[in-house]
Amino acid sequence: MLPEEDLKIIKKELGREPTLVEQGCFLNLWSEHCSYRSSAPLLKTFTSKGENVIIGPGDDAAIIKFDDGYVLAIGMESHNHPSYVDPYNGAATGIGGIVRDIISMGARPIALMDPLYFGPLDTPKNMFLFEQIIKGIAGYGNCIGVPVVNGETFFDRRYSGNPLVNVVAVGLCREEEVITARSQKAGNKLVLAGSSTGKDGLGGASFASRDLSESAEAEDRPSVQVGDPYTEKLVIEMTLEAMEKGYIKSCKDLGAAGLGGASAELAAKGGLGAHITADAVTQREPNMNAYEILLAESQERMVFEVAPEDVDAVLALVAKYDLNGAVVGYLTEKPNYTVEFKGEVVVDIPIDFLTGGAPTCEKSSVAPIPQVEEGKAPKTPEDLKAAFLKVISSYNIASKEWIYRQYDHEVQLRTVIKPGEDAGVLKITDKKGLVLSCGCQPRATLLDPYNGGKNVVIENAMNLAVKGADGLAIVNCLNFGNPDRPEIYWQLKNSVLGLGDGARELSIPVVGGNVSLYNESDEFKTAILPTPSIGIIGKVNFETPLPSSFFAKSGDAIILVGETTADMGGSEYYACFEALNAGKVPSVPKNAPEIIKAVIEAARSGKLSSAHDLSLGGIAAGLARMCRNSGAKVDLSEVSELKAEELLFSEAPARALLATSEPEAVLEILKDVPHMVIGKVEGNSLEVKGKDFEISLSLKEISDAYSSLTRFMMR
């Protein structure tokens, strides 16, 4: 049902009662999911322009200049609510939707990333959600031939009733091949192509704009779309061929609000209106009414703007791929959105009012009762080795091999660096590669939304830096609870400010994304952790070898870059020892941009064998991860005057470990930023000492701990 306040505004504008179908249009297009009515004022604070930005926010995907005439299409979406109600189909159709956003811009999809957030795997329900969501992503992505090359998986009890499925997609085309969702000319036809239209996904946009009820799995299942990846693959090839032949003037994927949303937004973006004949839509089920035809979110569908003289050729092309195609309307000079069904006009609305008239507001923002519990930090553990192994065996740090082995991450033969390292790398040309990273730090963001949001950018930028890449663009997915609660809106507001400031300091534009609110569970009486997840892309030159994330050469000097601080709030170490709300979140250092630039220069010099970002689990987790094939001797005595657990497990931002056989040259590159030689790659064990501790771990002990998640899932 439409909120009463919205209904009053609509009645005043129309001068009458809206029809049932019109109410459905407003319910979906004015939903939080479609209109960003709560977050729009905040999103405007992002810097979205840059020298490489061709198309920024507002289209199905952003377009970023890459190299040698190539451009990248990039977008990020969530499919959170559907993935709780029906995890396999919810996750699968999340992949399908973002891929269609990419092809609607004229680009071929070449990569996916999947930041995922789950409750702990200690209940049958959470285990079911985890397994089915991974299967859904693998089942859809593998079938359409798009590799999942990077991702993040994070576990916390506050995601138990509301897992998060975020997806980043990247596509590639020539700049002259770009198509937009901006309508071109009145009189052009609207062709609906792809799968037939059923009742699945009906009301999906409005469903995604409210909290999950205890009965959501039964009541909301019809709102979850059902995907067919084999049809999607045909849609990809058909759409790109139609664009190559010059038949498509503008194009939009059918996602939230179905045909109604796509056709109205496409027309409005070009300053035109549209007339839709609902009867003309190819229907999967008998006796569908106008409401269902217009607003169902059946998957694998596109709407094309086609010149009248090209309609027959387009329909023939659609038929060649054994897909459904029909002329369902046309563009009009009059900026109205009208829908006809069985000879009766059931929708007649000013199109700008429908697509852009949702009232936006900056909600009340109040800081919550402080989350930090002073004095609750865990004591220094008596057995540091046991603590070390406990932290690196945490599922948030441990290898995600069980997940990414289910993905075909080498399809299309572009993958240079496979999943499991700091960033994915794809070959675009013989000389240039695309570097990708994604993720978030939810626990830190809960305690300090500003610094948490800022550090999301810094950490992901460092993931690119250790491969020698600087950032080209950022997309985001802002996952939060109910914004009507002042403390939740405060989290959202400050996370956005931190994320925006971090991106500006690194001169990386924020070019698009998604807002997913109302992520709360009636069943568990919880809101998710504030989760401003991002995807970031960069460019790397293949003229010098890319550093590995793992120690590669015995005898290499190990260099710590950046400053290690005592603040441990939001860290994985604190979480492992039941101190979730203790401590202060480390601030991003003012010289973070300079540190990242220095790491990029070092990686590009060709003098690094290995390089690894430090984040969750700190130096301990970083060393353990790098010791995959070789041991190391490390001395932290001179790093700083910190306790043993602070030295080992601090997650202070803007830090990295580098390994090189030419330390003098690398130290010269790092001379203007904090750095220190802390050890050497050697032996078959990891030996770490400080002023008052020594730890020795065999490579087998490290491997067993680091493979904890894979061993648990394979048991």
UniProtKB/Swiss-Prot annotation:
It catalyses: N(2)-formyl-N(1)-(5-phospho-beta-D-ribosyl)glycinamide + L-glutamine + ATP + H2O = 2-formamido-N(1)-(5-O-phospho-beta-D-ribosyl)acetamidine + L-glutamate + ADP + phosphate + H(+). Substrate binds at residues 78-81, 100, 225, 297-299, 516. Pfam families: AIRS, AIRS_C, FGAR-AT_linker. Gene3D superfamilies: PurM-like C-terminal domain (3.90.650.10), PurM-like, N-terminal domain (3.30.1330.10). GO terms for molecular function: ATP binding; magnesium ion binding; phosphoribosylformylglycinamidine synthase activity. Mg(2+) 1 binds at residues 77, 514. Keywords: ATP-binding, Cytoplasm, Ligase, Magnesium, Metal-binding, Nucleotide-binding, Purine biosynthesis. Pathway: Purine metabolism; IMP biosynthesis via de novo pathway; 5-amino-1-(5-phospho-D-ribosyl)imidazole from N(2)-formyl-N(1)-(5-phospho-D-ribosyl)glycinamide: step 1/2. It is found in: Cytoplasm. The active site is at residues 33, 79. Its EC number is 6.3.5.3. GO terms for biological process: 'de novo' IMP biosynthetic process. Mg(2+) 2 binds at residues 101, 253. It is an enzyme of class 6 (ligase). GO terms for cellular component: cytoplasm. ATP binds at residues 36, 476, 513. Part of the phosphoribosylformylglycinamidine synthase complex involved in the purines biosynthetic pathway. Catalyzes the ATP-dependent conversion of formylglycinamide ribonucleotide (FGAR) and glutamine to yield formylglycinamidine ribonucleotide (FGAM) and glutamate. The FGAM synthase complex is composed of three subunits. PurQ produces an ammonia molecule by converting glutamine to glutamate. PurL transfers the ammonia molecule to FGAR to form FGAM in an ATP-dependent manner. PANTHER family: PHOSPHORIBOSYLFORMYLGLYCINAMIDINE SYNTHASE SUBUNIT PURL (PTHR43555:SF1). Belongs to the FGAMS family. Monomer. Part of the FGAM synthase complex composed of 1 PurL, 1 PurQ and 2 PurS subunits. NCBIfam families: FGAM_synth_II, PRK01213.1. This is Phosphoribosylformylglycinamidine synthase subunit PurL. It comes from Methanosarcina barkeri (strain Fusaro / DSM 804).
